[in-house]
Amino acid sequence: MNKLRKFNSKYMFLILVFIICFLGFFVYLKGDMYKCKILSEDEFATLKTWTVEKDNSKVILPCGFKYTGEPIVLTKKIDKVNAFDDSQYLMVMSRYFDYTVYVDDTKVFDLTTPQNGFSKTMGTQLRLVRIGKDLNGKTIKLEIRPLLGDHIQYSVVPMMIGTRSDIVWHILKTEQSEVITAVLIIIFGFVLLLLAMIIRCSEYEDDESGKMFYLGMISVICGIYLACQFKVSHIIAPNGYLPYYFEFTSLMLISVAVSLFIRTNVEGAIKKLYTSMSCIFVLNVLVQTFLNFVLKIDYKMMLFVTHILIGLFGILTLSTMIILRKKKSIQYMLISIMFPIIGSVIDIVRLYRLSDDKTIHFFSMGLYIFVLMQVTRTIRQYLTKSRSHLKAEVYEHLAFTDGLTELNNRLSFENDIN
C-alpha cells in the first residue's frame, strides 16, 4: 500500500504529461484527417473559381508562398434556375484576410469602410453580407488579401449563400462540441459563484468559500473567452464588435482571476506579490479599454503587452509551484493546471500545422478538466471542515446539556469544577 502511494505521488504527473503529449503528437501526424485540400503553388496560381456547394470543405493555401500583394479573386456565377429573395445572405470569412465583395463588378461590401467608428480590423472574423434577390445570371466576386505575410498557412472557406437561419445552423453544427463545452463551463462557473455566496453567508465562513468564488470567476471568464472565439457568436451578436471586445477583455481578465485564486493558497511575501500582479492586470485592462474607446487604438496592436504580462505571470506561477512543491495544494494545482497549458500548446501546433479554425479545442477541454479537479478538491475540503464543525457542536452539546432532561447544566458543571 505504501509503495502504491509512493508511485502515485511520484509518477502520476509524468504519466499525465506523457498522455497529453502523445495526443498532441497524434494530432500533428494526422494533419490530413480533416476534410480539406492543401494546394500546391502551381494550383494556387491557377485558382480563380469557387463553387457554392452544401459541402463547405475549406482550402488550405500553400505555406511559405510569396504573396505579391495582389488580391486572390474568387468568383461564382449564379445559375438562372436559382431563386433568391431579399433574405439571402453571403457568408464570408476574414480570418487573417481583408476582403471586398462585388456583384457584377458593383461593390456591395468593403472592409476599408470603418465599422462603428473603429478600424477595419476590429471584429471582422466573419460577416453576413446582404446580397438581395436580383442575382440570377450575375457573378459574385470575392477579393481577399492576406494580412499576416507568408509565415502561416491560410485557409479559405468557400462562399456560402442562404438565409440567415440556415447559415447560423450550419455553422453551429460544425462548432457544436466547442459550444457545449463553453456553455457547460459558464454554467459551472455561475453555480460555483452561487455556492460561494451561500457558504459565505452561512455560519461557518472560511477560506474555502473564497477559493470557490475565484474558481467560479475563472470558469465564467474563460467560458466567455471561448464563446467569443466561435464564428456563430460573430453572426448572432447585434454588433460584430461585441465578441471582439469581450474576447480581448476576457483574455486579460483570466490572469486576474487565476492570480486571486493562487493568492488563497500562498502566504507571506508571495501572497503580496500575487496581489500586486492582480492590480497590474486590472490596470492593463483599464488602460487598453481607454486607448481602444477614446483613442481608437485596435486591441490587436496592444496584444503584445497582454502576452508579455501573461508570460511573466506564467513564469511567476511556475516558480511558485516549484518553490512550494512540497505543499499538497500546490502539487494538486500543478497537475491540474498542466491540462490547459499543454492543451493550448496543442492548439497552436494545430493552427500552424493544419491552419485549423478550431484553435481552442484542446485548451477548452484542458480548462474543463482543470475546473473539475479544482472544484472537486475545494468541495471535499469544505465538507471536511463542515464535518469538523458539526462534531464540535455535538461535543459541546453533550458537555453542557443533560442527556435526559435536555436542560442546560453549564452552571452546575462550572460549580463542580470550582
Where are these regions (language model features)?
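Juxtamembrane interface at the cytosolic side of transmembrane helices
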Residues: 192-219
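Aromatic-lined ligand-binding clefts that engage carbohydrates, nucleic acids, or primary amines
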Residues: 82-103, 142-144
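First transmembrane helix
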Residues: 172-202, 308-321
